[in-house]
UniProtKB/Swiss-Prot annotation:
Name this polypeptide is given: 2-oxoglutarate dehydrogenase E1 component
Species: Staphylococcus aureus (strain MRSA252)
GO BP field: glycolytic process; tricarboxylic acid cycle
EC number: 1.2.4.2
Cofactor: thiamine diphosphate
Length: 932
């Protein structure tokens, strides 16, 4: 037989689940060949004339006349699609199913004798070589799909992925653990449970959020890390909430027992930190509870030097998920080169551990999973493990979700879901094996639902029987997984009963020895750790100077495009104006051009830049144009990939319509790669509060709590321009409330050159003790305002200025007006129309840290000063007024009058009607400039 004939003749073997349909079509063909498509006519002709081809099809076609084969196919499809509903995945308290589809042989009017007369090939194309008949194959399928792992994959739209999973699941397979490996697995479980029991006995009532009931999580993580090491994956990023965290810290990151017990005893744990540097732990000066802390373990495993990181996490469940994704992507990106970064998904992988109540309950999970296949955010597949103890504090599943499983929300992202019985440790290992194989093959997420229970209450001081008495009657009687697996090994003759109990006691002995090393007298008596000395000062200006020719060379390069690249004529006119600052005396650099020049010089310095946000490539207000589009072909060109002498990458992406996940991602990216200048830009600053959890619990407090540094920059468009209460305010007051201990820099600028110098200063601070978040109340209409634009000589030298003033005659000034951002520009333009030398406008460019010294020095130069005014466009209870008042009050003291001009206190940020806005805005300006 020729190769060509062989390919044609063997094609029917792949009918698989479509065999019932093919039988119908084959019968139609026998009646009328023209009734089927031409390609099937050729195929069926081959079958008809060759008895050696596809015996399953020919032998069953006669049986199909009474619908037998169709019933068999429906049974097979139901087992694949709904077998999980009868799977043995609940260690205790199985739910009562109201509606379970037909899954038994007799449900389809079939019996053993009938099925034994049908080829196994009807069940799955590769079963004909394994089983004698369909009955044997279906028994195998029932055992597989109704066993300790419940598989859900038929919802996946991709045929290749679905077919791969079907074959992998249905091919006879068993985790081949030899006796030594089984002993090792038992020891892992003994350590996991023994640790919890020791803490429970010796620190009664202390919160630890025990892992008991889903103990298998630890060996699952260890298996994952081992597989990753064998594949050469060097970086593992783990995110989880507090449930089981202490156990993961001790048995996955190998945090010494002495350190953990020290934390329970409130003594200094750092004296027990391994001296070999294999474990990295950081701490802030205010600290955090022990079950929020993370760490980094470095280990040589199977020839791979692995870095295993457990991210710090607040109590806000699931919010760490995008942070872990960002950290992973940072580990995968090569940014020390010109152009765009190259991403190697094989370098790192994320593992995100969820709770069963929180996974469907918190929207951040959907936002994060949506990042999975996006160019700017993909990490090549995340492993999600649900530690499913089937309760959320006191809330049972019936009140926690509207779906059968907590994992059902993941189906929309076309990912496989495996539910596994937490008491069957070998099954949990197999679930990990399949998940890791799928990730390696398809670079997509996998969800494993580890179905167990919670041994105690939400925390160890809680009594669960108050609200959940019936489940806990059974849980209290249920044996631990350590005992279940240990007895299994005893029954298999792998260990003896004495060995089992001896090792359990050995774990307790090791814990007691660790406990004995800790001196109770070593109580920590310093409630405030010292902050880094570098945080005593504001962000320092970058004083590097540039020649005119240097900046011109950069500008020319940014305005040079590939031959034949067709830019929209309207846009080209805008871009061509960027030559004017270099070839016209009155040429000015506007905001967008200042940003481009700053970015280019930063790239030349070797600092990579990553800018993301909704519409950030063009800019919400059509000002940036960092990515150009050929109007004829649609091809793109990014000028900042082609900067002369560029030493680092420029990465820019339009983000999905998400705030919390995207900001969390960028935060995580910058924490992992502190050299990266990460910027998140809000479409409008008003929408930034969708990320408030990231701001509150990570960005502004992480260093104080965990010693975790971040230099993430936020661009938040903010200004009152008559666009209503949802397109006016970035809630400046919220950021000023979060500002303390020099934990950030908050600015509202009025000068493009100051913006240039600010960006350079922020970039220079990265990967140093000085680094901190930067919050920019970025402009909207001011993007094209000539008052904001500055001549090129303000860019060639100098540095960031915290306050700006116009020229003035000191002895004539009787009134100083302090304002910021657009309010300052509005006042300046109004004053230009009616000049008054007695009024001095001062732009407060940097709001935090507040420039007290600079303002004090300025006021001291004005001998006839009578009044100081703060003017803002926000309502009095919003904006900066309540923040600046204590500072200004001290500066003014009893020497000058102090006044406020702005909107009155309001519940909403701004007026909804544009005309009313103008009236209010003009009245503020008029009253502020009025010299009493």
């Amino acid at each position: 037989m020729t190769n060509e004939r062989k390919e044609v003749s063997e094609a029917p073997v792949n009918f698989g689940a479509n065999l019932g349909l093919m039988l119908d079509l084959y019968d139609d063909f026998l009646q009328d060949p023209s009734s089927v498509p031409e390609d099937l006519q050729v195929l069926f002709s081959t079958i008809k004339n060759d008895d050696s081809i596809v015996p399953a099809l020919k032998s069953t076609s006669s049986q199909n006349s009474d619908g037998t084969i169709k019933r068999v196919m429906r049974l097979i499809d139901n087992i694949r699609q709904y077998g999980h509903l009868k799977a043995d995945i609940y260690p205790v308290n199985p739910p009562k199913r109201k509606h379970v589809p037909k899954l038994e042989i007799e449900d389809f009017d079939l019996d053993q004798q009938t099925l034994e007369g049908i080829s196994a090939g009807i069940v799955s194309d590769h079963f004909a070589d394994i089983y004698d008949n369909a009955y044997e194959a279906i028994l195998r399928m029932e055992k597989r799909y109704k066993g300790p792992i419940a598989f859900e994959y038929t919802h996946i739209n991709n045929n290749t992925e679905r077919g791969w999973l079907k074959r992998r699941i249905e091919t006879p397979y068993k985790v081949t653990l030899n006796n030594n490996e089984k002993r090792a697995l038992f020891k892992q479980l003994a350590y996991v449970e023994g640790f919890e029991k020791y803490l429970h006995k010796n620190f009664v009532g202390a919160k630890r959020f025990s892992i008991e009931g889903v103990d298998a999580l630890v060996p699952m993580l260890q298996r994952t890390i081992t597989i990753a090491a064998k594949e050469g994956i060097k970086n593992i990023q783990i995110g989880m909430a507090h449930r089981g965290r202490l156990n993961v810290l001790t048995h996955v990151l190998e945090k010494p027992y002495e350190m953990m017990i020290s934390e329970f005893m409130h003594t200094d744990p750092m004296k027990f930190l391994p001296e070999d540097g294999s474990l990295q732990l950081t701490a802030g000066w205010t600290g955090d509870v022990k079950y929020h802390l993370g760490g980094i373990k470095t280990t040589d495993s199977y020839g791979t030097m692995q870095r295993i990181a457990l991210a710090n996490n607040p109590s806000h469940l699931e919010i760490v998920a995008p942070v872990v994704e960002g950290r992973t992507r940072a580990a995968q990106d090569d940014t020390q080169r010109a152009g765009a970064p190259t991403t190697d998904h094989h370098k790192a992988m994320p593992i995100i551990i969820h709770g069963d109540a929180a996974y469907p309950g918190q929207g951040i999970n959907f936002e994060t999973m949506n990042l999975g296949n996006l160019k700017g955010y993909s990490t090549g597949g995340s492993l999600h493990i649900i530690t499913n103890n089937r309760i959320g504090f006191t809330t049972e599943p019936i009140d926690a979700r509207s779906t059968t499983y907590s994992t059902d929300v993941a189906k929309g992202y076309d990912v496989p879901i495996f539910h596994v019985n937490a008491d069957d440790v070998e099954a949990t290992i197999e679930a990990i094996d399949i998940a890791m194989e799928f990730r390696k093959e398809f670079h997509k997420d996998v969800v494993i639902d580890l179905v167990g229970y919670r041994r105690f209450g939400h925390n160890e001081m809680d009594e669960p029987s108050i609200t959940n008495p019936v489940p806990y009657q059974n849980i209290r009687k249920h044996d631990s997984v350590e005992y279940v697996f240990g007895k299994k090994l005893v029954n298999e003759g792998i260990i003896s009963e004495d060995e089992m109990h001896s090792f359990i006691e050995q774990v307790q002995k090791e814990l007691r020895q660790a406990h004995d090393k800790i001196n109770k007298a070593d109580k920590m008596d310093n409630p405030d750790m010292e902050k880094p000395a570098e945080l005593a000062l504001p962000l320092q200006a970058d004083e590097q100077s540039f020649t005119f020719d240097h900046l011109k060379e950069i500008n020319d390069a940014l305005l040079t495009y590939p031959d034949g690249f067709n830019i929209l004529k309207k846009l080209n006119k805008v871009l061509e104006k960027r030559h004017e600052p270099f070839n016209k005396e009155d040429g000015l650099v506007d905001w967008a051009q200042a940003e481009q020049l700053a970015f280019a010089t930063i790239l030349q310095d070797g600092t990579p830049i990553r800018l993301t946000g909704q519409d950030s490539e063009r800019g919400t207000f059509s000002h940036r144009h960092a990515v150009l589009h050929d109007e004829q072909t649609g091809e793109t060109y990014t000028p900042l990939h082609h900067v002369p002498d560029q030493k680092a990458t420029f990465d820019i992406h339009n983000s999905p319509l998400s705030e919390a996940a995207v900001v969390g991602f960028e935060y995580g990216y910058n924490v992992e790669n502190k050299k990266s200048f990460n910027i998140w830009e809000a479409q409008y600053g008003d929408f930034a509060n969708m990320s408030q959890m990231i701001f509150d619990n990570f960005l502004f407090s992480s260093r104080s709590k965990w010693g975790e540094r971040s230099g993430l920059t936020l661009f938040l468009p903010h200004a009152y321009e008559g666009q209503g209460p949802e397109h006016s305010s970035a809630r400046l007051e919220r950021f000023l409330q979060l500002a303390a201990e020099n934990n950030c820099t908050v600015v509202n600028l009025s000068s493009s050159s100051n913006y240039f110098h600010l960006l350079r200063a922020q970039a220079a601070s990265l990967d140093s003790e000085q680094m901190r978040p930067l919050v920019v109340m970025s402009p909207k209409s001011l993007l094209r305002n000539k008052t904001v634009a500055k001549p090129i000589d303000e860019f060639t030298s100098g540095g960031f200025e915290p306050i700006l003033t116009e020229s003035y005659q000191a002895d004539k000034v009787t009134k100083v007006i302090l304002a910021t951002g657009k309010m300052f520009i509005d006042l300046k333009e109004a004053l230009a129309k009616n000049p008054d030398e007695s009024v001095l406008l001062v732009a407060i460019e940097r709001l935090y840290p507040f420039p007290e010294e600079e303002i004090e020095a300025l006021l001291a130069q004005l001998p006839n000063l009578e009044e100081v005014s703060w003017v803002q466009e926000e309502p009095k209870n919003q904006g900066a007024w309540l923040y600046v008042y204590p500072y200004v009050k001290v500066l003014v003291a009893d020497k000058y009058d102090l006044s406020y001009h702005g909107r009155i206190q309001r519940a909403a940020p701004a007026e909804g009607d544009g005309e009313i806005h103008k009236l209010v805005q003009n009245k503020i300006i008029e009253n502020a400039l009025k010299n009493n």
